[in-house]
Amino acid sequence: MLHQQKVVEIYTDGACSGNPGVGGWGAILRWNGHERELYGGEVQTTNNQMELMAALCALKALKESCSVDLYTDSVYVRNGISLWLKGWKKNNWQTVSKKPVKNKELWQALEGVCSFHTIRWHWIKGHTGHPDNERADALARKAIAEYRENGCFSA
């Protein structure tokens, strides 16, 4: 009997106060009537790194192979995973202009976790009132605020 993959919707966002600076990421996972919020951050990071971390940490949180619709407002993440990654690997992790790919370790980690799931990547325009994108953004900003208030990330 074939195993039916659990269907999961994920909404992700990253934020950075200064670029580089203190950054946060947020993710909402929704499946079968359930929902989970995740967030975290880094002290010295970039917005693109936080966008990657949001997707990476959300996918790592899945405990079994799933069918995933992942929504991001980051063209960098969506294009990187679906258009640029194969070329980067073929070119020994260099861009078409022969420069080292930024955030190589995060891209490698994301590619690794993606291999366990069936993922459809979706781009949604950020800061246009999409409720789940706004919630993911609020979680990313919450991580930054908690760091500023407590000197650490609590999530």
Swiss-Prot record:
One of its GO terms (cellular component) is cytoplasm. Binds 1 Mg(2+) ion per subunit. May bind a second metal ion at a regulatory site, or after substrate binding. One of its GO terms (molecular function) is nucleic acid binding. Its EC number is 3.1.26.4. Its cofactor is Mg(2+). GO terms for biological process: DNA replication, removal of RNA primer. Keywords: Cytoplasm, Endonuclease, Hydrolase, Magnesium, Metal-binding, Nuclease. PROSITE patterns: RNASE_H_1 (PS50879). Mg(2+) 1 binds at D13, E51, D73. It is found in: Cytoplasm. The keyword Nuclease applies. It catalyses: Endonucleolytic cleavage to 5'-phosphomonoester. It comes from the Bacteria. Its main location: cytoplasm. Mg(2+) 2 binds at D13, D137. Belongs to the RNase H family. Endonuclease that specifically degrades the RNA of RNA-DNA hybrids. Monomer. This is Ribonuclease H. It comes from Bartonella henselae (strain ATCC 49882 / DSM 28221 / CCUG 30454 / Houston 1). The gene is rnhA.
